[in-house]
Structures are given as C-alpha cells and as structure tokens.
Amino acid sequence: MRRCRACGSPRLLYHSELYDLSIAHIDCDAFYASVEKRDNPELADKPVIVGGGKRGVVSTACYIARIHGVRSAMPMFKALEACPDAVVIKPDMEKYSRVGREIRTMMQELTPLVQPLSIDEAFLDLSGTEKLHHDPPARVLAKFTGRVEKEVGVSVSAGLSYCKFLAKVASDLQKPRGFSVVGEAEALSFLAARPVTTIWGVGKAFAATLEADGIRMIAQLQEMEESELMRRYGVMGQRLFRLARGIDERHVHNNDPVKSVSSETTFFHDISRHEDLVPILRSLSEKVAWRLKKSGIAGQTVVLKMKTADFKSRTRNRRLDDPTQLADRIFRTGLALLEKETDGTKFRLIGIGVSDLRDAGLADPPDLVDRQATRRAAAEAAMDKLRDKFGKGSVETGYTFRTRK
C-alpha cells in the first residue's frame, strides 16, 4: 500500500490482492439522515437527527451531529443536550424502505448473491462476475458506489476482502464515502492492531470479561491456543480463535430467512397501569400479525419486550403448541406475559413479536377445545378481508379503538 504523492492521503492507491478479492460489504452512510438531506437541500450543512420525540432514541445521526457526540440508540434527551441546534426529524420508514429497495435492486444487477443485513447494508459475492461486467470486482464495486450517489443521492461505504468478517470491518474504516480493502496476506497484522470489540459478538459485556482476563487486543488472542480459548469461553472461544486469524468460511447467501417479526413503541410519558398498556399491546400485535400474513409466515414463540423508565430491558417469551399468524393469539399470549410484569413499574417502551418462524401452511389449526378461539379467528379473517379492500384503518377492534380516544 502507498500514499498519494500529491496529497499524502493514506487511502488506498494500490494493493497486491486488489483484483483477487470478491467479497464485499456495502453500507450506506448515516442512511436515514442522508435521505432526509437529499430531500431537503437546506439541511446539507446542518446537524440532523432522525428519531422519536424527547422520550425516544436516536435512529440515525448525520456526521455533523456525530461530531457533537450524538450516536445511534442514544436517548433523545441526551442527544439534544449534546447537540441542541440539531434538526430532529421523525423517521419515515416507508420512504427509507423505498430508497433501500432501489439500492438493493442496483446491487442485484451486479450479482445474484446479495445478502441483506438491513435496509441499507448487504454482503455481495462478486466471484465470477468479471465476464459479465468486463471488470474485476474491485472496479465494479468502485463504479457502484459512485453510481448510487449519483442516481439515488446518498453516499455509501464499501469494504472488499476475501471473507465476510473482514469485508464488514473494512467498510467501517473510512466512513463516509469509504472504499477499503483487506487482503489475506495482511489479515493477521491488520487484525492484531485492533481491539477485541472488532470481532462479531464481542459487545461491551463480553469485552469486559475479556479485559478482566487481561485481553484487550486481537494480537493477544492470536497468541492463544484454540483449546485454551474454548476452555475459558466455550463455543465463543472457537469464534475468537478463528476470527482473530481472519478465518471466516461463511458464504454469502441471498435467501437468509427472517428470524423474527416484531413491533414496538416508545411512550411520550411513562406508563405503569396495566389497563393502559393492554390496548397498546393489542395494536402492536395486529401490526405483527399483518406483517406475518403478508409475508406468508408464522411464528411459534411469542416475545414480549419492555423497557423501564430507567432504561432497563425485560424480555419474556412463551412457545406455542403450533405456529400462529393471528393477532388474537399473539395478543393473548403477550397479555399473559404482561400480567406478570405490571406491578407498578413505570415503562417507557413495549414491544411484541414472534420468533421461531415457520411456513404459514402450518399455522393456526382449528381449536377443537376452545370454540371461542375458533370464532375469534374467523372474525379476524373477516376483518382482514375488509382491510384488504378498504385499507388497514377501515376496521378496528375495541382494544385498538381505545388507543385513539
């Protein structure tokens, strides 16, 4: 690697493996905020925060806001303390999803092997695409980043390597508008100089465990035997051993299944009364059920998520006898879990979802014992038909109607 003779930039000019690498990670830069700035040029030089009201959290902060210390998932009141002049914009997920799909389509023009991680990032396997594009993957990727900014109006950062782990690490190196490469020959030395939090799965809690054992840098992991790491940290020890050496044999898949479907909301004021939480839970359950039905899937485990006024999270779950995509079953299962949590505690957030997803053909067999459940399922099916014909807000249950009072 060498620096530019004209400006001295350390950004890559030459790499011995540049035309041999084919695994890419694409990540849009401050995506939600970038879309808002694209649609309103007056925001170009202003700090922009996309997120909820004062009681919500930051979804995305533009790079100007980040200079002031604003970060994703930061409570909004703290973000505004750090950057009081920020322009706060309520998230428009429909718009972001639309832009994300546009970029995804452009990715799929490069290769059929596109593995989305979210609406604004994905892995791409560009192996074997040279004949199609008449260019090696590195050039194809560089052209792609420029095309996205020109045609869509948002910038992206790209990482190119020989494996998924290092491609993702590389895409974070020079944001925004980054294009970074990590080759196989340099992987060990590149990783050795980085903290253990670079490794997937090493969050704050596990990093603290490693630090208690005197391990802060990946170089220290590289000096340890796999057996010793597994003795100390179990299966995670094997991951530490392999990723610390740049060993990642996972392939890019374009059909990774969705693992869960959920919906949550943050309250404007803390809520402690059970009767006030019930209609909100019902409304969220209907949103989850609607998404399941539209996707042709069902979930067998219902998950209740709550966050207390002091930001402590609670997660409860219950496995059903068979998969469901009915709002009524999701709600009633969640309600049983909720009843054990409403003891006067003040909550700032509630969410409901399902995991352990299955094909919808296995969902909700007739209940031969509870005839009322069968009637409720029939009523829900009738409401679904009305919503399909007249819109989602055309018919509501008594529970959800109470939330609009």
Swiss-Prot record:
Record-level Gene Ontology MF annotations: damaged DNA binding; DNA-directed DNA polymerase activity; magnesium ion binding
Pfam families xref list: IMS, IMS_C, IMS_HHH_1
Catalytic activity: DNA(n) + a 2'-deoxyribonucleoside 5'-triphosphate = DNA(n+1) + diphosphate
UmuC domain span: 23-203
The keyword Repressor belongs to this UniProt entry's keyword annotation: no
Role, per record: Poorly processive, error-prone DNA polymerase involved in untargeted mutagenesis. Copies undamaged DNA at stalled replication forks, which arise in vivo from mismatched or misaligned primer ends. These misaligned primers can be extended by PolIV. Exhibits no 3'-5' exonuclease (proofreading) activity. May be involved in translesional synthesis, in conjunction with the beta clamp from PolIII.
Protein's name in the database: DNA polymerase IV 1
